[in-house]
Amino acid sequence: MAFDFPDSYRYADSHEYAWQDAAAVRIGLSAYAVDQLGDIVFVDLPEVGAELNRGSSFGTVESVKAVEEMYAPLSGVVLQRNEALLANPEELQNDPHGEGWLLVIQPGDPSQMDQLMDAATYAAKVAAT
């Protein structure tokens, strides 16, 4: 299956994305990760004000197949969480790179974005799996 990974996004090995919008960064799960999970039934996200540490778990996503941890692609403080997604977790499947975003954070170290994969590198990694 072919996936569309937006060029302006950066991707972590653990399949989360980060998208810089002015001083804030939107975080979500890639379309590949969402596809692998199947039907999503529950999403657990941290509260606004919570601190994220790059590479550490910040929540879980539950599908009919499994419960998976989600890992922070960047360190920072949660500014916003997608409340609509908490009420309707299936939105994550419908539009993972758009309305299915998870969090907006204030990054602690914006240079961490440079350590994430660009879309072409991530697409090649996914194609090789």
UniProtKB/Swiss-Prot annotation:
For the modification N6-lipoyllysine, the affected residues are K65
Q: Which residues form a coiled coil?
A: none
Keyword Ligase part of the UniProt annotation: no
Q: Which UniProt keywords apply?
A: Lipoyl
Q: Does the keyword Kinase apply?
A: no
Q: What cofactor(s) does the depicted protein rely on?
A: (R)-lipoate
Q: Name one GO biological process term.
A: glycine decarboxylation via glycine cleavage system
Q: How does it assemble?
A: The glycine cleavage system is composed of four proteins: P, T, L and H.
Q: HAMAP family given for it?
A: GcvH (MF_00272)
Functional note: The glycine cleavage system catalyzes the degradation of glycine. The H protein shuttles the methylamine group of glycine from the P protein to the T protein.
Q: Which NCBIfam families match?
A: gcvH, PRK01202.1
What this protein is called in its record is Glycine cleavage system H protein
